[in-house]
């Protein structure tokens, strides 16, 4: 995790308590804790400390949010503890891909904890696991679909 993705956790916890939302940020707490001050200064953002995690997530774990079941897929590379959350719903397949995948690209690996080889393995894993009709919601900017990325993203051409 990076400061720009965990900054809202404290506010959410103040409203809803230790909910599933906090679990999304808890996979690898060493990177944000070690670098959060550096990230705040580099990006010029103020983010409250997210506090202690309520649960650490691992590959295959599930999170229930209402009647939706989110499956945890470990996707290190942008950060060591990166995850994607996938749900197959009546309305269609959806994946919260964070900064692992972007339209035509992938997340940065030049920041602290980034690993180019790991993110390439993560993209290959997503290409095999996620159905083509999956809508991918990114951590920044536009959404995409697995079908589009499999056709157009040079980092998914394996």
Positions of predicted regions on the chain:
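Active-site HxH/HxHxD metal-binding segment of metal-dependent hydrolases
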Residues: 1-63, 151-155
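Metallo-beta-lactamase
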Residues: 39-41, 62, 68-74, 79-158
